[in-house]
Amino acid sequence: MKFRRVFVLVLLSLFLVSCSAGKNEKPVEETAKESGEGAKRIGVIQIADHIALERARKGFEDEIKNTNPDVEIISKNANGDLTVVPSIIKSFQDKNVDLIYAIATPAAQGAKNGEKEIPIIFNAVTDPESADLLENLEEPEGNITGVSDYFSIEAQLEEMISIFPDIKNIGVMFSTNEANSKFQIEELKKAAAGFGLNVVEVGVNNINDVSTAIKTIEPKIDIFMAITDNTVSSASTIIAESLKEAKIPSFASEEGPVENGILISAGVDYVDLGKKAAGMASEILGGKKVSEVPVVFSTDTRKVVNKKTADALGLSEDDNLMKDAKVVE
């Protein structure tokens, strides 16, 4: 009888231990899931596929992973199709992202129009105000701030004239669909007038118009300037080849088009801009309000020359062109 009672007590003890272990297992599982909730999730939207925007994305992603190793990045590319931007923003909302990184003006505008609460960091936007992204650069209102790729047009023209002192007519192409580009054209006209230079402009609706457009202005220009325009950047190889055949030098505001054949750039570094955006994102993910993170403008610039294009134009021995330049083949 005593043995039976002891046996029952042992079974009861084992049962209680088992129940206790079962209760402990569930909280351990929930804790593991909750640890995942601490990892931040960022939605990245890139408006088109060209070197400058790729660099702005890579600079951001590399830097944000360096400072936030557990961050999850969901990257989407609209491939130049503005109609898919709303659905990309919706997909970020469905994924409950903590922050949106929008690369280029149309991506930033789409993000702002589609989302009013999730913090948005833009990049590769020349004039955030004329793009209607915000009004206060120092204390951004709403949920959006970011990095501007604006670089002084006057400084670029000074560099251009120092290399090509005899130029009179500057050719420029722009997308009629980008407010960013229209702003740059107006700035260029004002600055060029101060140097006694004339601007010959041509607008394009899409990349299919580029070949014809560049041919129409080549007889009228001494040099071509590639502004930071998504259509122009995407078609920079086409533009560069046409200009080389016409023996017309070309100038860009950033390095990407130079890798595609444009002669020279003196302007911003988009990898650096991406890193700056990542720093802003880290501040916001760390608890800062968007209004406490002012818009950033680049102060770092560099000169890059395409060696093959310089050779084709007979300029590879030009000291003014090659001085202090990074050379790409």
Regions found by a protein language model. Give the residues of each.
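C-terminal motif of bacterial Sec signal peptides marking the signal peptidase cleavage site
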Residues: 15-18
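Bacterial signal peptide processing site
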Residues: 20-23
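Extracytoplasmic "Venus flytrap"
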Residues: 34-61, 67, 74-83, 177, ...
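An alpha-beta-alpha
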Residues: 42, 60, 145-192, 294-309
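Structural motif
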Residues: 72-94, 203-217
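Beta-alpha junction/loop-to-helix N-cap segments that form part of ligand/metal-binding clefts
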Residues: 77-135, 229-244, 248
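Hydrophobic alpha-helical segments within soluble ligand-binding/sensing domains
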Residues: 128-167, 268-288
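Flexible loop/turn connectors
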Residues: 256-308
